[in-house]
Amino acid sequence: MNLPRANPPTSAVPATSASSLARWITPERAFAVIAFLFGHALVLVIPPFQAADEPFHFLRAYQITDGVFISRQHDARGVAMGEFPVSLYQVWLPFSYMGFNLSVKASLQDIRDGLRIRLNPAKRMRIAIPSTAYYSPACYLPQCAGIMIGRALGVGPLAMLYLGREANLLAWILLGYASLRAAPMIARPLFLLLLMPMSMYLASTASADVSTNAFAVLFTATVLKYSVLPQPDSIGPARFLALLMLSLAVCLCKFAYVPLLALLLLIPPRNFGRPARYAAQILVLAAASASVWLFSISIGPGLDGKIRLTDEVSARMQFQWLAHHPLRFAPVLLQTFRLKGWVVLQSYVGLIGWLDMFLPAAFVIGYLILLILACLPNDDKPPLPPPWRAAVIVLPAVVCSFLIIALLSYLYWTPVQAAFIDGLTGRYLIPLSPAVFLVMSSAMRRDSRFRWPCSARTLNALMVLISIFACIYFLAVVRNRYYG
């Protein structure tokens, strides 16, 4: 007699646990976790003041917490100055020899000694802040919050620096998370951009570039979200206020990125409602942004301000030379691309310290290729603006912003009549990158050959693994630079 076979015992672990985990790993959640873990590691591993201009960013943030929102003091050379506690200079001094010198390593004893220095705000001295005095307080909102917490707790200036770094990192994570939530159609390249070594290095310091980059990225992501809303009249007061605040933030942080406001034209007029309402709201956005932009220019250095402290650089003389020879700027740009193009790409992906150390060429090239591949779609959802519309609006705005950045670098950082532009670094391209991703992603969707043959979950998991590897490698390189 044949007896029926018993079914094998089922596992106590649900079969759907792996798929549930895969569903949970969205780009914004993965970014928040990875950025939080590796960002805090970098905050501690990067020695004090070891990012480009971090001492001056810290001084400017402290100056704002003193109530000096617009810096007006200058010395006889036209260099911006400020009155600061002597202790801020004392904590910087032991670390001032590390920049541009790979042989000098960090000392944990110097950090411990620096943490023992008290603020003593009554004892002050004049300190030059040539490169950051003209920055708007909007660039330093997180750092100021950290410093004010430190002042309330009565800690020393070096502890305030670390609190400013912490606040900067948390702001980067929060705004990056919001950007990824707003623009799932470009989430993969945006994810890689936000976790790129250069982005994470800056986010772990007191640099003003963090707010500048984060606001520009969130502005682009928000405009992209609003441009594909399915219902007419979908931009109500709350969404319009978000557009207005982000537009003003972009203008306040760095006016070279004001051309990005042209991306507002990606939003169909019907999304604002009636034609009269659309015209009125666009007029409000334009007028408010123009006012803030003019304010930013008014508090700038002017042509007589000195940012690079060398007699060979004069913004006024450079401007006068360009005014008489405007066609010379094109050959200067071409020569810059020829001589400095690779350096710009290197400093876009990852740069350690004060131009101290670049990542290997293979890593840089590989990461750039990954950014391009991440723009490839695996389906047609969520929607994107048509490629022709995206290109016509976005590319002129990006080119215009880049030309402004190049011109400012030529005026304020390059010797007069030099054949190429000095001071042009790749980190200035980070705020422009999401707009470029938008154009690339929209164009690739037009051709069915440009498709990933796998699911979005698989792509997200692969992207997370690559980013974790890149962060671990970068953290090891930074540690070896300063403590190896």
PLM regions and their residue ranges:
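Interfacial juxtamembrane loops and adjacent helix segments
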Residues: 68-163
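Hydrophobic alpha-helical membrane-interfacial segments at the cytosolic entry of transmembrane helices
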Residues: 239-247, 271-298, 391-400, 460-466
